[in-house]
């Protein structure tokens, strides 16, 4: 028996469908959907997850051509040769520079230039209080010293001081730094000189040299140096300075070591260890002192000295030494 369709129900059903279609068109107009070809949809990839924003580095990165600083105000511990197993800051805050330090720097002049005996004589003559202090530290004279007596000591302590610091260019080597040949830096063991060279954009810390670096925090800093000289970079992998020694203290300690190391070495270089005591550091530290009968050759702090080396106040047979920094 055929199913009968009630006319009223048919009309109601048709009206319901029409209403639903109209409502759908209103909620989702045709422009809502982008018309994208099927082929393009198949070639699309999912959007990658956003990468995390990297944290800013605390280590200042020099721009190309810039020199790395010797000193800064940021504590950046690094793993270096010494101390082993402990990261330390190789670039401490800038050292204090006093009036006499500035006079010494002025005497040094441009990096790599020579310092004459007359310049050092003038420096001492201008600073009699410094000379008196050094004189008092060594008992008022540099004699009797074996070997020194043959040089006919000068009538004044000041002139003797000039001689021991100039005859082997010790003043220039230690306090100013030298350029040897075309690619080597000699000496350079005065913290204020490092600061001056940094501020003038002349020299900086040698990068990627951690295996050669040694630090006794707050006291001794041994590091590589690169410097701009005559339009090119000159470098040395191992230089160093005492952070707590100003120019007057270097001259005083060096003169003390010269007199205490009472040995007749003639023209041969003799080496000893000198203990530096300073109230800014908890423990004394050693400095390597080198001289011959003519004068002071070099004087620099060492974080890892040869403990078997003779002390400056002890007599010992002369033995060959390695080239000085």
Task: Please report, for each region that a protein language model flagged, where it lies by residue.
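Low-complexity, intrinsically disordered/propeptide-like segments
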Residues: 12-18, 30-31, 44, 226
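Signal peptide processing junction and immediate N-terminal pro/mature segment
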Residues: 20-41
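Functional cores of ribonucleases/endoribonucleases
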Residues: 35-43, 47-90, 94, 98, ...
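Low-complexity, intrinsically disordered tandem-repeat tracts enriched in small/polar residues
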Residues: 12-26, 49-61
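Bacterial N-terminal signal peptides that target proteins for export
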Residues: 2-15
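Short non-domain terminal segments
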Residues: 11-12, 26, 31, 283, ...
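Non-Sec secretion/translocation targeting segments of pathogen effectors
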Residues: 1-2, 19, 323
């Amino acid at each position: 028996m055929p199913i009968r369709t009630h006319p009223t129900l048919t009309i109601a059903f048709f009206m319901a469908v029409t209403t639903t279609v109209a409502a759908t068109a209103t909620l989702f107009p045709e422009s809502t959907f982008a018309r994208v070809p099927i082929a393009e949809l198949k070639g699309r990839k999912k959007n990658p997850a956003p990468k995390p924003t990297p944290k800013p580095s605390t280590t200042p990165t020099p721009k190309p051509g810039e020199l790395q600083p010797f000193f800064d105000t940021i504590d950046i511990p690094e793993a270096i040769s010494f101390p082993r197993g402990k990261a330390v800051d190789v670039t401490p805050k800038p050292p204090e520079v006093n009036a006499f330090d500035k006079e010494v720097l002025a005497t040094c002049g441009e990096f790599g230039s020579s310092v004459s005996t007359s310049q050092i004589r003038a420096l001492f003559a201008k600073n009699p209080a410094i000379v008196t202090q050094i004189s008092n530290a060594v008992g008022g004279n540099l004699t009797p010293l074996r070997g020194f007596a043959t040089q006919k000591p000068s009538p004044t302590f000041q002139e003797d001081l000039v001689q021991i610091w100039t005859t082997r260019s010790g003043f220039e080597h230690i306090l100013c730094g030298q350029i040897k040949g075309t690619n080597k830096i000699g000496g350079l063991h005065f913290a204020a000189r490092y600061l001056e060279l940094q501020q003038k954009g002349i020299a900086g810390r040698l990068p990627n040299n951690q295996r050669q670096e040694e630090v006794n925090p707050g006291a001794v800093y041994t590091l590589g140096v690169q410097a701009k000289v005559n339009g090119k970079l000159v470098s040395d992998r191992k230089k160093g300075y005492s952070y707590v020694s100003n120019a007057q203290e270097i001259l005083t300690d060096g003169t003390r070591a010269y007199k205490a190391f009472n040995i007749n070495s003639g023209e041969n270089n003799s080496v000893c260890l000198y203990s530096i005591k300073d109230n800014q550091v908890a423990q004394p530290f050693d400095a390597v002192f080198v001289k011959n009968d003519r004068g002071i050759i070099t004087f620099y702090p060492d974080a890892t000295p040869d403990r078997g080396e003779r002390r400056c106040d002890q007599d010992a047979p002369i033995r060959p030494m390695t080239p000085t920094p």
